[in-house]
From Swiss-Prot:
HAMAP family: Salvage_MtnC. This is Enolase-phosphatase E1. Binds 1 Mg(2+) ion per subunit. InterPro entries: Enolase-ppase_E1, HAD-like_sf, HAD-SF_hydro_IA, HAD_sf. The gene is mtnC. Pfam families: Hydrolase (PF00702). Bifunctional enzyme that catalyzes the enolization of 2,3-diketo-5-methylthiopentyl-1-phosphate (DK-MTP-1-P) into the intermediate 2-hydroxy-3-keto-5-methylthiopentenyl-1-phosphate (HK-MTPenyl-1-P), which is then dephosphorylated to form the acireductone 1,2-dihydroxy-3-keto-5-methylthiopentene (DHK-MTPene). Transmembrane segments: none annotated. Keywords: Amino-acid biosynthesis, Hydrolase, Magnesium, Metal-binding, Methionine biosynthesis. Its EC number is 3.1.3.77. Its cofactor is Mg(2+). Pathway: Amino-acid biosynthesis; L-methionine biosynthesis via salvage pathway; L-methionine from S-methyl-5-thio-alpha-D-ribose 1-phosphate: step 3/6; Amino-acid biosynthesis; L-methionine biosynthesis via salvage pathway; L-methionine from S-methyl-5-thio-alpha-D-ribose 1-phosphate: step 4/6. It comes from Erwinia tasmaniensis (strain DSM 17950 / CFBP 7177 / CIP 109463 / NCPPB 4357 / Et1/99).
Amino acid sequence: MIRAIVTDIEGTTSDIRFVHNVLFPYARENLPSFIIGNQQQPAVAQALDQLRAEVERPEATVQELIDVLFGFMDEDRKSTALKALQGMVWRDGYLNGSFTGHLYPDVLPALRRWQQQGLALYVYSSGSVAAQKLLFGYSDAGDITGLFSGYFDTHMGAKREVDAYRNIASQIGLPAEQLLFLSDIHEELDAARDAGWHTVQLIRGAADNASRHRQVTDFDRINQELLNS
């Protein structure tokens, strides 16, 4: 029986276009000035040092690191340091009202229903935990962070690695067979299933014929029969 649901964000709870057409361009435009203006702040300095370690360039200047970050953004690399810095920039955008976090209309009613049924809800995204909390804290529907029991990012491991899901199961404190992962990417679901989890793939756009996972078009179609399996 499912006791906890872990959901992805991009393409699952939220339109991928919000991430790619709103969040990413905002970060790209504002990241250099943010880093230069805040490089002495502990969180920013820590992320920059983490980036130096990641690229094995301990003497890299701030401008050199900014150039590295632009390269990472061009590659869509899942860098923990990049995600942390993007999250800090996005915080400014949410706070100044430049945007709110997109939610598909089926998401909030389903989350509330599952919580009322006693299911614990979690988030696992390649975006930093801070960025996840911002999206749900400043969502189109207001602050819904109270629905979630916890958040996970790439500190748990990459989303296509089996060990990431083992680490998350350990953090949650439930056996894998009681966990359900929701994502739009079948390679992520493959890793979760290999770790013993239940899986459901959200198909918000074109069908994924290469997938071997149960597919639904929205959260409403994740039915009670599945949750009781």
